[in-house]
Curated annotation (Swiss-Prot):
It is found in: Cytoplasm. This is Ribonuclease 3. Belongs to the ribonuclease III family. Residues 155-225 form the DRBM domain. Mg(2+) binds at residues 41, 114, 117. NCBIfam families: RNaseIII. It catalyses: Endonucleolytic cleavage to 5'-phosphomonoester. Keywords: Cytoplasm, Endonuclease, Hydrolase, Magnesium, Metal-binding, mRNA processing, Nuclease, RNA-binding, rRNA processing, rRNA-binding, tRNA processing. Residues 6-128 form the RNase III domain. Pfam families: dsrm, Ribonucleas_3_3. Its main location: cytoplasm. Its cofactor is Mg(2+).
Length: 226
């Protein structure tokens, strides 16, 4: 695999593997090799659940078990992990078999989400529980700041998606139309196309995720759901 791509990924993760073979295994789908990432994924899934549960317990001392469970489910579900994978540009690093490559596996949410969990397992084996806990909390910083008990825990993208799914309408599409500024200080502009709205709605933010959330917020307002 291209070392430039691997080094770029490690910078985005905020962690450099001592055992590079663990990183390569974490990026390997079962379609590509018998030494794939599913065992690492199993481990990472449990670690992620523990770290997020522990952090929610610390942040919300008066919230009951049911609300904490719902918040944890929101934070560790597949589409959240896939969104995080796209922030890392993980798709370009995946090791996939010919069939998955041909069918666009590098874009598939389930593969992206599973790979994030495998990376968590890999970092843990390469270091220790304290290192991976710190890293997970860094990755989740903005999401943990935004989440709250009850329905308000759902971010605009999630609320918009659930609204459309409940009416059997197509999911919204998000398109980056402009990126301005230097790498350390960028502004993203997103167009969001939503069934029921004649024109795309526009969102801007300092990251693609924030711009998409801003666009979804505008869509909810136009649909009079906010």
């Amino acid at each position: 695999m291209n070392p430039i791509v691997i080094n770029r990924l490690q910078r985005k993760l905020g962690y450099t593997f001592q055992q590079q073979e663990l990183l390569l295994q974490a990026l390997t789908h079962r379609s590509a090799s018998s030494k794939h990432n599913e065992r690492l994924e199993f481990l990472g899934d449990s670690i992620l659940s523990f770290v997020i549960a522990n952090e929610l317990y610390r942040r919300f001392p008066r919230v009951d078990e049911g609300d904490m469970s719902r918040m944890r489910a929101t934070l560790v579900r597949g589409n959240t992990l896939a969104e995080m994978a796209r922030e890392f540009d993980l798709g370009e690093c995946l090791r996939l078999g010919p069939g998955e490559l041909k069918s666009g596996g590098f874009r598939r949410e389930s593969i992206l989400a599973d790979t994030v969990e495998a990376l968590i397992g890999g970092v843990f084996l390469d270091s220790d529980i304290h290192t991976i806990e710190r890293l997970i909390l860094e990755w989740y910083h903005s999401r943990l700041e935004e989440i709250s008990p009850g329905d308000k825990q759902k971010d605009p993208k999630t609320r918009l998606q659930e609204y459309l799914q409940g009416r059997h309408l197509p999911l919204p599409s998000y398109l980056v139309v402009q990126v301005r500024g230097e790498a350390h200080d960028q502004e993203f502009t997103i167009h969001c196309q939503v069934s029921g709205l004649n024109e795309p709605v526009i969102g801007t933010g300092s990251s693609r995720r924030k711009a998409e959330q801003a666009a979804a917020e505008q869509a909810l307002k136009q649909l009079e759901l906010e």
